[in-house]
Curated annotation (Swiss-Prot):
It is found in: Cell membrane. InterPro entries: Multi_antbiot-R_MarC (IPR002771). It comes from the Bacteria. It is a multi-pass membrane protein. GO terms for cellular component: plasma membrane. This is UPF0056 membrane protein bbp_399. It comes from Buchnera aphidicola subsp. Baizongia pistaciae (strain Bp). Its main location: membrane. Belongs to the UPF0056 (MarC) family. It holds the Pfam family MarC. Keywords: Cell membrane, Membrane, Transmembrane, Transmembrane helix. The chain crosses the membrane at residues 7-29, 39-58, 71-93, 108-130, 137-156, 176-198.
Length: 199
């Protein structure tokens, strides 16, 4: 049970629904509310299929590449640490890229499903998890589905969240999520180091 909760929290933090709220709203704001919901659900379904594919194929990919679990754990911890740093200290360039991603036409696959939800960092994490817990794939699927559903709900209720917290409140929550992700990534890194040196 603890593993499901920790993996679910990790996946939610990487999906970063609060950080993606303003981008999703900007991309879909020119559409009718009903059409907006349909597109959002469609894109989230596509993202889920892609994430499940990487979760199931991740173990086989890592075996094919002949990577040890310790190596994947250390490198995964470093990647997640860098993501968390960007969440806490967003740079001007990252904000500029977020602004450039906004388009007026109706989105399909890119940029909502990929890379905003099913981004490279999340897909790499799913591969890592499937490699670390090959016998607990059902637990991983459950964690992924819970994280995905929470993300869907937050994005569907984007208007309410932005009215409730405001842009500054959402930014503060995202920084808090980044702080939690730093702790999780550090633990992942240390676990990999301990396993490598048989501590």
């Amino acid at each position: 049970m603890k593993e499901i909760i920790s993996v679910t929290i990790l996946l939610i933090l990487i999906m970063d629904p609060l950080g993606n709220l303003p981008i999703f709203m900007s991309i879909l704001k020119h559409l009718e509310p009903q059409r907006r919901k349909k597109i959002l659900i469609r894109e989230m379904m596509i993202a889920l299929l892609i994430m499940l594919l990487f979760l199931f194929a991740g173990e086989k990919i890592l075996i094919f590449l002949n990577l040890r679990a310790e190596t994947v754990s250390v490198s995964g911890g470093i990647i997640l640490f860098l993501i968390a740093i960007k969440m806490i200290f967003p740079t001007y360039e990252s904000k500029k890229k977020s602004g450039n991603i906004i388009k007026r036409e109706e989105p399909f696959l890119v940029p909502l499903a990929i890379p905003l939800v099913a981004g490279p960092s999340l897909l790499a994490t799913l591969m890592l998890l499937s490699h670390q817990y090959p016998k607990k794939i059902l637990y991983l699927i459950g964690s992924l589905l819970i994280a995905w559903m929470i993300t869907v709900v937050i994005l569907l209720l984007s208007d309410i969240f932005l009215r409730l917290f405001g842009s500054k409140g959402v930014n503060a929550l995202e920084r808090l999520m980044g702080l939690i992700l730093i702790m999780l990534s550090t633990q992942m890194f240390l676990d990999g180091i301990k396993s490598w040196f048989y501590i």
